[in-house]
């Protein structure tokens, strides 16, 4: 038994950096486990949760680094198409994925979490998601997915309705 209990915290913007520093020390320096889920903020960085579902006979990752590069290019095209002015600021993509797929009895799960250093409100994030959905099949049609694109590109995270596991945290 893990002896892990749920709780809810409201960390102010002023305290967020201190929280992240303490979290980093706890997880990455002291090698301790954490089980933290956070909500995406309105006027926060763009977070994209890509959930892949495959037939249970699949036991290895189906996407490659080329798929990820193509997705980043799709996003950059979306920024250029949707937003008039990006102020020539550098755009960073932080890509997070597990090393292996998760093989269950009836489905194989995989996915990618992406954080982009662009601040946007929820309505802008949803507009960006719509752009992704309209174009993603052009780059990833060959992936043998069992789920549709609407469920691949998780809407709840971009609306702020779902938790996002903090990097380094795990499920209990």
Residues of each region from the PLM?
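Structured partner-binding subdomains within large eukaryotic complex subunits
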Residues: 148-172
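Signature for HUH/AEP ssDNA processing cores
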Residues: 1-147, 164, 170
């Amino acid at each position: 038994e893990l002896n892990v209990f749920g709780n809810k915290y409201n960390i102010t913007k002023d305290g967020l950096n201190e929280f992240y520093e303490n979290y980093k020390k706890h997880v990455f320096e002291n090698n301790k486990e954490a089980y933290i889920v956070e909500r995406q903020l309105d006027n926060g960085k763009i977070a994209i949760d890509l959930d892949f579902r495959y037939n249970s006979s699949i036991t290895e990752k189906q996407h490659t680094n080329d798929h990820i590069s193509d997705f980043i290019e799709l996003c950059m095209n979306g920024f250029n198409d949707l937003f008039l002015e990006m102020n020539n600021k550098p755009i960073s993509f932080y890509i997070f994925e597990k090393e292996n797929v998760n093989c269950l009895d009836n489905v194989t799960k995989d996915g990618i979490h992406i954080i982009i250093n662009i601040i946007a409100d929820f309505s802008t994030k949803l507009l960006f998601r719509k752009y992704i959905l309209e174009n993603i099949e052009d780059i990833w049609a060959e992936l043998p997915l069992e789920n549709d694109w609407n469920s691949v590109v998780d809407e709840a995270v971009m609306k702020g309705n779902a938790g996002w596991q903090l990097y380094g945290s795990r499920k209990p």
